[in-house]
């Protein structure tokens, strides 16, 4: 048996040993702080934050901030602009004041890394939804393009994988409608220079 075959066998054994008797795996989903910041955003938008443990989200976001004011995509990357903006947004939506040291340091990092205009599209999308970024700064594909015959359409959703279609089609509609749900904190955050 080759070294590769033995390595594959060992990896399979480790994975199968962790499988539950019902056939699935149960483990912690590890990610960066964007999942938490986005959950805060959704709960604030839907008004479901009142009966949720938002204090845990606040603690989690604060505890994962780096000394340079940023939040990382992965451990040791030195800080990621988009993730730092989303964490900042999450903290503001949770009521953290703009003059608190964690946000002052975050703002310094964000500005030194280029600010919102250099962030990823999804970060800008989250900010646009709460009125803190202009929808005109986001690229969009009009949803009606899906109605064009394939022969003349520059784009067909069937060129995308099934999982990509599942998120692209709804996003095309949202980008077309350009909704803005301003929360009080969202309005206050919009006046900040980040």
Residue spans for each PLM region:
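Preference for long, amphipathic alpha-helical scaffolds in soluble/luminal domains
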Residues: 1-194
